[in-house]
Amino acid sequence: MSKIEELPPSDTDDHSYSSKPGDVFLAFVDAPVKETDDILVEDSFIGGEPKWLHPDSEPPAELLKCGACKSADNMKLLLQAFSPLDDEQMSAIQQRLGINNMSYINPQDDRVLYVFLCTECQRKGNSVRCIRGVKKNKNVDSLSEKMASTSLEKDFQINPFDLSNNSDSKCNAFSSNPFGGANANPFGADSINSNISQSKDEGKKKESATVSAKTARKLHDLQKDKEYDGNKCFKSCLLYVEEETFKNKKPAHLQLPKNLKIDKEALDLTGDEDLEKDPIKLDPRTEKLSKFLDDDTFQKFQEVVGYNPLQVLRYDLGGKPLLYAETKVDILSTVPRPGYNPSSQRIFEMQLMPKMIFDLEEVVSVDNGMEWGTILVFTDVENYMPEFDEHGVGYVEECVKVQWESRT
């Protein structure tokens, strides 16, 4: 059974985006991968070459082939996302679905999602594939400690678009709860005196840390970008993650006037009668624009993305996808149960955003470029793995749904 299908536009309005602020994490491009960078399993990045969970443990060859042309020659990595699970979150999601099997959910396990695309078979079934990899981790270190150690080793996650340069808001959404271990009330009576006495020292330390981070970033940017074979890979960039907020104003170019009107003289019509009979009898480009303007789902997509237009990935485990266009059927009803675990079901986990195309392609081509609007990934809520190899590594294929860019 094909795990990918085109979701055609429809006149129905059965779906709406309902995730709330705080539910969603966004990934943005941080910096190009450099020749000196040591890519780790814990890194999340777009393009480049996959980092498998063990050097001697790769997925079965069949999973690395295009499901349409049955060849691996044109399969390129779009995304590698380090996405370990939080047991409390997964328990709550399972309970909501009436499922109770936490046997395969361990926050200490390495868990990675790989998304590949065949550049020669766009719009064909199974031309985009997602592989979920899990590596059993017997270390006693907690996930938060592991992530903290990783960030210390490679801390270039400075948002170049954040004028405040406050890196505290950056976190890894593919790890456990980024808000765990919150500080006690800073306004409590016991803390006031200590805060006053420590404010100067903390201010100096924070200033020093900011300078060090800026210096590290500048030194990193001066390094040579890693080169890839364009026939096998897209260029690669590391990602950083933030919680979704709507504090930014929507860009002006995404704001459509409410009193938008179409000038009859701009249309390819023979007269007023044609306009009255068929008000959307336009040239192909104008007709395509008109269809998008009439698509409330696409307008919602633009509205939500407009607050954070640089996002390349949305992560909303157990939530609902932000659809690119209206669909004839309920997407969730078309997501199959995992064949390797038929008693379970899949949940939405993440979606790739169209901004990623511009970051991956050196030259954007109208004729030969990528044509997807968004790529949705659904994964097994039980995180089941049929078997692990001698290195404690296992790989399975997960479900992908693609909404393609309209050609009409």
From Swiss-Prot:
It is found in: Cytoplasm. GO terms for cellular component: cytoplasm. Keywords: Cytoplasm, rRNA processing. Residues 1-20, 190-214 are annotated as: Disordered. GO terms for biological process: maturation of SSU-rRNA; ribosomal small subunit biogenesis. Pfam families: PDCD2_C. Its main location: cytoplasm. Residues 1-17, 199-208 have a biased composition (Basic and acidic residues). GO terms for molecular function: unfolded protein binding. Belongs to the TSR4 family. Present with 125 molecules/cell in log phase SD medium. Required for processing of the 20S pre-rRNA at site D to generate mature 18S rRNA. PANTHER family: 20S RRNA ACCUMULATION PROTEIN 4 (PTHR47524:SF1). This is 20S rRNA accumulation protein 4. It comes from Saccharomyces cerevisiae (strain ATCC 204508 / S288c). The gene is TSR4.
